Amino acid sequence: MTEAQRHQILLEMLAQLGFVTVEKVVERLGISPATARRDINKLDESGKLKKVRNGAEAITQQRPRWTPMNLHQAQNHDEKVRIAKAASQLVNTGESVVINCGSTAFLLGREMCGKPVQIITNYLPLANYLIDQEHDSVIIMGGQYNKSQSITLSPQGSENSLYAGHWMFTSGKGLTAEGLYKTDMLTAMAEQKMLSVVGKLVVLVDSSKIGERAGMLFSRADQIDMLITGKNANPEILQQLEAQGVSILRV
């Protein structure tokens, strides 16, 4: 057995066990204790394992920074990035924003991370990211954890109405001249309670959702202050929304 073969087997043992003794290496490879120690020393020097007393440990790989999904594979990713960047530029220093769940919401939170603004969210993937990145001001809305959406939902009539931000950014499954539609009723109802206390409601949807009607009506068009969407959005729907006082930004 060559040295390279021994090293490969030793590393495979560590991958399975996490720790091996010199005695175990000798037994498995049929080599002398001196050869086993020499192999461990070489692999330690090359950074492939950690040498410890009477054996070796597997090196714990640093966990990659977590994101809720492979964002680059999200539908209409590039358009959503442009939408998030445009939305982040609306917020001034010292203001507070409410950001809800979804891929666009996460992209927006990532854009705003590190800026001198307060971010209020019930979306745990975003909250975890902001905390990991040491964003100065993060408020996590409390409640029962909803596994399917990775959010917290508080009981009806609870303190969520106290989370009044200058801005509320939200998305949905469809937007028509009637308003914004969401398919998850629990999350929609939880967010609806904040509509009366936020300063401005900004809807972030990619162009594929313009003209779509799915689920429940979350907010009427006349409740929406601004829509940020893609350049391919249905112009007829956009005109109807503008006629109802919605500011339109296409990116």
UniProtKB/Swiss-Prot annotation:
PROSITE patterns documented for this protein: HTH_DEOR_1, HTH_DEOR_2
Keywords from the named record: Cytoplasm, DNA-binding, Repressor, Transcription, Transcription regulation
Occurrences of domain HTH deoR-type (ranges): 3-58
Subcellular location: Cytoplasm
GO MF entries: DNA binding; DNA-binding transcription factor activity
Keyword Repressor set for record: yes
Stored HAMAP family: HTH_type_UlaR
Listed name of the protein: HTH-type transcriptional regulator UlaR
Originating organism: Escherichia coli (strain SMS-3-5 / SECEC)
